[in-house]
Amino acid sequence: MREVISLNVGQAGCQIANSCWELYCLEHGIQPDGYLTEERKAAEDDDGFSTFFSETGNGKYVPRTIYADLEPNVVDEVRTGTYRSLFHPELMITGKEDASNNYARGHYTVGKELIDQVLDKVRHVADNCSGLQGFLVFHSFGGGTGSGFGALLMERLSVDYGKKCKLEFCVYPAPQVATSVVEPYNSILTTHTTLEHSDCSFMVDNEAIYDICRRNLGIERPNYENLNRLIAQVVSSITASLRFDGSLNVDLNEFQTNLVPYPRIHFPLVAYAPIVSAAKAAHEANSVQEISMSCFEPNSQMVKCDPRNGKYMATCLLYRGDVVPKDVHQAVATLKTKRTIQFVDWCPTGFKIGICYQPPQNVPNGDLAKVNRAVCMLSNTTAIAEAWSALSHKFDLMYSKRAFVHWYVGEGMEEGEFSEAREDLAALERDYEEVAADSAEGDEGGEAEY
């Protein structure tokens, strides 16, 4: 069996996880107490979800997931919430004091006390797996726990499970909805630390998701639950191929193989369609062609950037629901004729396709309409570098005045780590520029490479 362990770090990680497990349970017919629903028991046997759930002796299903936060409030809500009997109580680990939006506290002082306890539980869950495939790590860039403790966890996982692949789902700080002023510092420090430890990072930008909720779903003032439920749909689409049998299965390593041309360039842009509210759903056809096209629209993307300014290196289209390969091939053929989708010239215009026949589920009374097919697009495009440059600019404004730096140094960090992280990010931006620059220009004298 190819199991996957989810690790949820900090407030953002834990709250996104709540929405994800709520959705997984609906998709697999598991009740909030961990037992299968009657309809599910009657249905034919499908053990695909044992990648995400382990079964106990008395037929209860327990998520293979660990909650870790340096302060107890968010995890306490899970401990007392609807799904309190679903999760294993020992796999919810909380500290006493939070990281107070400070990367250094999450990574050095406060995080250091909790990390061994978390890794001990990871080992415990991993020992229950017959063939552990890898880890999904959910965290934010802006918070102290998400950035600092998240980075520390990634480092330690590399040491303990070097060969296993690690995918991140990270919440990118949104310009409009910042919760703390030092988000640019935390983001750049955590990106620098995790760059070599993560195999593939799916970034989610809060602002982009706010806009989707406002524009496509008509929610005037979206709250975190609205955002997280949308994120959960995306995560569910990405992991559907691991949990259900489809005609074209994708496992964790395949994401990497298909999306990451160079180890550092591992930040695919995620888009999802159709995102329609229940009120409008009846008037939309949502053909395979339509939803495939709308994935390339900027307003279905999870990060604010304009892919028309960049070039694509690789694209995965993950369909689910009522989709037949013939329609997909037609849709892809049409996409290839569109000149707006520009690939780098050293890469064939290949689209990796995955199809999972399980239709997308939706949360009762949720914002999203019930649809019979959906698609999630993961594309590695050079346009995502825009997100980095926006962040670097804010970092520079503050760091030029050394604003707030003393809080980090006071927690045992060296000031040199700031400039080191900033240089690493500048190098990352340059990597993206080089990839986008036409490779044909530099190759006149380079025949020897082939």
Curated annotation (Swiss-Prot):
The keyword Kinase does not apply. Its cofactor is Mg(2+). One of its GO terms (biological process) is microtubule-based process. Its main location: cytoplasm. Mg(2+) binds at E71. Belongs to the tubulin family. This is Tubulin alpha chain. It comes from Zymoseptoria tritici.
